[in-house]
Amino acid sequence: MEEQTYSLKWNPNPPLGVERLVTYAVAAAVYTIIAWLGVIALPMGFLSVSALYIGMGFLIPFVLWFSGWGWVIGVIGAIVGAGILAGMPVPLAIPFGFVELVVQIPLLIVYRTLGPKFGVSPIGKDVFKPKGFVFFLIVGVVLAQLWSAVTGNFMLYLFGFVPADALPISITAWWIGNMIAVAVIGTILLGVLTPVVERLGLTVRGIIT
């Protein structure tokens, strides 16, 4: 499969079938459970803030593999796993979950547009190579997780769950925890499983299919 087949355009090939829907459903369930466990197992003292949010290490590969479906997986996991199951009221969990899009949409855009220009795989399968790892480290680990920490904590601040004077600590803890999870788990999943996922025809070539 050629790298240039990946873009942000509508691409109905391969068509959406039962096996793909099952794959996305399983991924959503996995991310939801891991998101919930991450929040309750290693809490920071603020609702839905984890000291080590391991779920992000899974979500980044899901977004790079499944494109728009990865966004859906992220929103479901954030609303249900990190939100409702963690004790957040439903009316607040829904907008909290959609904040995930603010992080994951730019990530996919950068990988699908700038990745090939820098000679990097748009689905992250070259993270075990120097160029691919450095690109992933800058885009997926450092910048994306900083943005996640800022936007997520700002939403919790608006909800009244994180006081203003605690924002610097909460943002820093969120950022560091996410970076560790993505750098370790995300790198391994992308490097080991991306060729398999692509070979099975499960990667999404356009924005959604």
Which role fits each region the language model picked out?
Residues W71-V72:
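Nuclease catalytic cores that cleave nucleic-acid phosphodiester bonds
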Residues Q4-Y6, Y24, A28-T32, W36-F62, ...:
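Membrane-embedded alpha-helical hairpins and interfacial helices in multi-pass inner-membrane proteins
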Residues P12, L16-V30:
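Non-catalytic interaction surface on structured domains
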Residues M1-G17:
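Short, Lys/Arg-rich, polar N-terminal cytosolic tail immediately upstream
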